[in-house]
Swiss-Prot record:
The protein, known as: Probable tRNA pseudouridine synthase B
Organism whose genome encodes this protein: Pyrobaculum islandicum (strain DSM 4184 / JCM 9189 / GEO3)
GO BP terms, alphabetized: box H/ACA sno(s)RNA 3'-end processing; mRNA pseudouridine synthesis; rRNA pseudouridine synthesis; snRNA pseudouridine synthesis; tRNA pseudouridine synthesis
Annotated CDD domains: PUA_Cbf5
HAMAP family with a match to the protein in the record: TruB_arch
Its job: Could be responsible for synthesis of pseudouridine from uracil-55 in the psi GC loop of transfer RNAs.
Membership in a protein family: Belongs to the pseudouridine synthase TruB family. Type 2 subfamily.
PANTHER family noted in UniProt: CENTROMERE/MICROTUBULE BINDING PROTEIN CBF5, H_ACA RIBONUCLEOPROTEIN COMPLEX SUBUNIT DKC1
Gene: truB
Length: 328
């Protein structure tokens, strides 16, 4: 997981017009809600869809969506984007996950042998979705970044697993038991991280309800702004490209980003990598794929740097200067 600590390469010094757009912290409460992300600590019991529906109802918005479905029996980090922010869920669609699982082996297990088998499962593995899965049951590869034995007590083991999106933890535990020759099943599972977002940053549904009530009843949105994150936070793990005011509306209309529109960007990024576009007021414009590597982008005076795949910002937030240039 790439979580910050990237270097910023500044191509040119540029200012931004205060009359257009606004920094996320300056949004009205209503705007802040509509472009927000909330990290819910999902309890065991309800489905991910039910939790998202509750957030939608609490905040009085027409839609809310979640990233990375958790089964009803699984608890932990569930990112939920609100209203206009749901368009930004693309940023988390392929994010890796970290789980802590309680496994029960069907026979006695030697600790050193278990550690050796866990080590064997690190890297690229093959998995077929379980029978109850909602996706097509075909063999596919998934990357297991790390498996760590936290505790072994008799036939019960606590295992921390950092895996690629779409990895079935229950199937992974089953396969580990098969290799050990004793069999195993998963008794409990908790997701402790999605990409750069950890369980330490999560809030309960009651926190969302309380924060919204305090704002509506007393006009104080301080608590609400702590519980909800600006949607810009959803791009925390992605390389960022900041653009001139004159390039913003063109991106909002789906035009690719050309080199003259780039002010600065985070490095490194590779060709084809998902990147996030930002204004000089740190507003999220949208997402796209880099058409060149960051080292090449540093030298470019003309040509295309990235394409646009998803637009978050409303058209017209910045004036359409690109149309004026086309007409002159």
């Amino acid at each position: 997981m790439k979580c910050g600590n990237r270097e910023i390469f500044v191509k040119t010094q540029e200012s931004t017009n205060p009359e257009w757009g606004k920094p996320p912290s300056k949004r009205t409460t209503e705007e802040y809600i509509r472009y927000s992300l909330v990290l819910i600590d999902k309890p065991r019991g309800p489905s991910s869809h039910e939790v998202a529906a509750w957030v939608k109802k609490i905040l009085g918005v027409e839609r809310a969506g979640h990233a990375g479905t958790l089964d009803p029996k699984v608890s932990g980090v569930l990112p939920i984007a609100v209203a206009e922010g749901t368009k930004a869920l693309l940023a988390l669609s392929r994010s890796d996950k970290v789980y802590v699982a309680v496994a029960k082996f069907h026979g006695d297990v030697d600790e050193e042998k278990l550690k050796a088998v866990l080590n064997e499962f690190q890297g690229v593995i093959y998995q077929k979705p379980p029978l109850r899965s909602s996706v097509k049951r075909q063999l596919r590869t998934r990357h297991v970044y790390s498996l760590e034995l936290l505790e072994l007590d008799g036939r019960y083991a606590v295992i921390k697993m950092h895996v690629e999106a779409g990895t079935y933890a229950r199937k992974l535990i089953h396969d580990i038991g098969e290799v050990l020759g004793v069999g195993a099943n998963m008794r409990e599972l908790r997701r402790i991280a999605v990409s750069c977002y950890t369980e330490d940053e999560t809030v309960a549904l009651q926190d969302v309800a309380d924060a919204y009530y305090i704002w509506r009843r007393y006009g104080d949105d301080t608590y609400l702004r702590r519980v909800l994150l600006p949607i810009e936070e959803i791009a925390r793990h992605l390389p960022k490209i900041w653009v001139r005011d004159s390039a913003v509306d063109a991106l909002c209309n789906g035009a690719p980003l050309a080199a003259p529109g780039v002010v600065k960007f985070e490095t490194p990024f590779s060709k084809g990598e998902l990147v996030a576009f930002f204004t000089l007021k740190d507003e999220l414009i949208g997402f796209g794929r880099a058409l060149v590597e960051s080292e090449e982008a540093k030298k470019m005076e003309r040509g295309l740097v990235a394409r646009v795949d998803r637009v978050i910002m409303r058209r017209g937030t910045y004036p359409p200067m690109w149309k004026r240039k086309q007409q002159t």
